[in-house]
Amino acid sequence: MPSRFTKTRKHRGHVSAGKGRIGKHRKHPGGRGMAGGQHHHRINMDKYHPGYFGKVGMRYFHKQQAHFWKPVLNLDKLWTLIPEDKRDQYLKSASKETAPVIDTLAAGYGKILGKGRIPNVPVIVKARFVSKLAEEKIRAAGGVVELIA
């Protein structure tokens, strides 16, 4: 029956302790860890980890992330920014005097996209960026788009 661990005590007095003759069973012949990735282990790196070494593209120095902040909101979700208790009230009285003001920036959205439909009720939408299609759909419903900084 094979044993789980080698019995080191039994190897006492036997020079190579079951590891062969002179020079066999050396410590770390290929180096430790990722050593030799660009040298003697190159075939493995190229085959199983393509693209591990090297660079691609250009660096963007002093990139200001705030300039690229633009979370999007589609038109079909626009009315979810109005509280539910007031939503029915606005939908019933579809007049320009009582049009709801939707501030998308305060809700955490940077741009409005034109996917989906909106009810045929005038709304005043305040946003930083609005796509062409979204603006057309809001205007078709009798609404107004205000661009804010």
Curated annotation (Swiss-Prot):
Protein origin, superkingdom: Eukaryota
UniProt KW DNA damage keyword: no
Transmembrane as UniProt keyword: no
Cross-link (Glycyl lysine isopeptide (Lys-Gly) (interchain with G-Cter in ubiquitin)): 96
InterPro entries associated with the record: Ribosomal_uL15 (IPR030878), Ribosomal_uL15/eL18 (IPR021131), Ribosomal_uL15/eL18_sf (IPR036227), Ribosomal_uL15_CS (IPR001196)
GO biological processes: cytoplasmic translation
Molecular functions per Gene Ontology: RNA binding; structural constituent of ribosome
GO cellular component: cytoplasm; cytosol; cytosolic large ribosomal subunit; nucleus
Chain spans, region Disordered: 1-39
Effect of residue 38 to E: Confers resistance to cycloheximide, an inhibitor of polypeptide elongation
Compositional bias ranges of the Basic residues kind: 1-14, 21-30
SUPFAM superfamilies registered for this protein in UniProt: Ribosomal proteins L15p and L18e
Stated role: Component of the ribosome, a large ribonucleoprotein complex responsible for the synthesis of proteins in the cell. The small ribosomal subunit (SSU) binds messenger RNAs (mRNAs) and translates the encoded message by selecting cognate aminoacyl-transfer RNA (tRNA) molecules. The large subunit (LSU) contains the ribosomal catalytic site termed the peptidyl transferase center (PTC), which catalyzes the formation of peptide bonds, thereby polymerizing the amino acids delivered by tRNAs into a polypeptide chain.
PANTHER family: 60S RIBOSOMAL PROTEIN L27A, LARGE RIBOSOMAL SUBUNIT PROTEIN UL15
Similarity comment text for this entry: Belongs to the universal ribosomal protein uL15 family.
Protein name from the UniProt record: Large ribosomal subunit protein uL15
Organism: Saccharomyces cerevisiae (strain ATCC 204508 / S288c) (Baker's yeast)
